[in-house]
Amino acid sequence: QKLMKCLSKQDETGVGDTKSVAPVNTIIQSIKGVSSSKEKDSSKVKSLTESVDTFLKSRYDFRYNVLTEETEYRLLERMEEGFAPVNQRVLNTFCLEAHESGISCWDRDLSRCIFSTRIAEYHPFKLYLEELPVWDGVDRLAALARRVSRDQLWVKEFHIWMRGMTAQWMGVTGSHANSVAPLLISTEQGYLKSTFCKSLLPPALQRYYMDKVDLTSQGHIERRLAEMGLLNLDEFDKYAPTKMPLLKNLMQMASLSLCKAYQKNYRSLPRIASFIGTSNRKDLLTDPTGSRRFICVLVEYPIDCEGIDYAQLYAQLKAEILAGEHYWFTKEEETELQQSNMTFYRQGPVEDVLRDRKSVV
């Protein structure tokens, strides 16, 4: 503005005011200095960003987990150790290493790179299934089911359920959620029921298994359906009959509408997790109409949980789904489930009296 006033004054007189020339030149030089300073600052920021980016890429491999919403890293020199989440402690270590390499930066400079959209996204379950080998054609599902029981109906039902679990991981279920849950039952202790449930997930996906399922908060369990791969209703008999309507509703959900703590808006997320359960009691079911949601199986012997060929097991399931094999239970198969589950109903007071009278007669 001062420059414009001086120039305007010169225009009015028609003659340059020698007294005002010096201030005008000073203002021009000042403007040039500010502009030059901004260019230098911009150049420094760009140089620092490039230095930080080059430093990180020279030492680490990064990826963004869309399920946990975490950035993960691994050392390029020790890639066999796998990925781990980037937390504040790790970020501070990155910053110290950058300083030791001669880069003058703050942890916020590193954060801008690490927690940006420049880090490639990945879905743990889809990545695992994409990297599977081609199925060799050998059926491994029947043998896995027979580790629990030799009952032929169980072998067939378990196979369908495993397809449903894998289909949810693949994101191809559409309107057919995996709405059925196997219940492994034995009155004897030490049959490794819970261990078998956990062993169904390959090592690369073990962190997405949970056996502490809280049915007191619907919002909490819905988040787990979107984040985990398998939820074990361990000691199924501890859940009150009043919780069964909520559980059956959760089992039928194909998609979820969630709002996380740090977010303002709800968003639709696909369901990933399936249910499984264990119990040491046989009298589990209370609702005959809801029994089609469970595959009750009596465990006949301690379960062998070792030596599972995960790569070929899931390659088989993936191949069957892509070939069009159904991963949901038909009406006929649901009827078979209800008939098979008759021996696992919980007797009420009236049934107990009638049973006692029959035994006397």
Q: What kind of region is each of these model predictions?
A:
Residues 9-13, 171, 323-327:
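Intrinsically disordered or highly flexible coil/loop and linker segments, enriched in small
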Residues 116-226:
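P-loop NTPase catalytic core of nucleic-acid-dependent motor ATPases
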Residues 1-139, 152-156:
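N-terminal nucleic-acid engagement/recognition segments and initiation subdomains in replication
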Residues 3-6, 15-30, 160, 164, ...:
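Short, functional C-terminal segments
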Residues 96-102, 108-124, 177-180, 207-210, ...:
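Feature primarily recognizes SF3-like P-loop helicase cores of small DNA viruses
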Residues 7-8, 14-22, 191-203, 310-313, ...:
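Charged/polar, low-hydrophobicity segments characteristic of intrinsically disordered regions
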Residues 67-71, 192, 279, 290:
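Glycine-centered small-residue hotspots that permit tight backbone geometry or close packing
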